[in-house]
Curated annotation (Swiss-Prot):
Record keywords: Ribonucleoprotein, Ribosomal protein, RNA-binding, rRNA-binding
Any GO molecular function: rRNA binding
Protein name: Large ribosomal subunit protein uL24
Highest rank taxon of the organism: Bacteria
Amino acid sequence: MRVKKGDLVEVIAGKDRGKRGKVLRVIPREDRVIVEGINIVHRHMRPTPDMPQGGIVKNEAPIHISNVMLVCPNCDEKTRIGATYLEDGQKVRKCKKCDEVVDK
């Protein structure tokens, strides 16, 4: 997967199209990511010893990786990502629009 935890992404399809958020978790087995503040769902929780009132809790649900696009930290645009190798042989991600390295 070309998106990693901590990356800034923009949603390109679905009810949250155009919104940006930070990737909280990547689920490679299902090709999904959990993005902060995106795809909010309401869970109805029954009363438990930890939460005696119960109630409705808002959580982020996973969104398919094809519905998000990485935002380049250098040019601040949503972009496709390519891979390249540095002189020392390390593989890094590269922005297709500005040709800058995305990885720290």
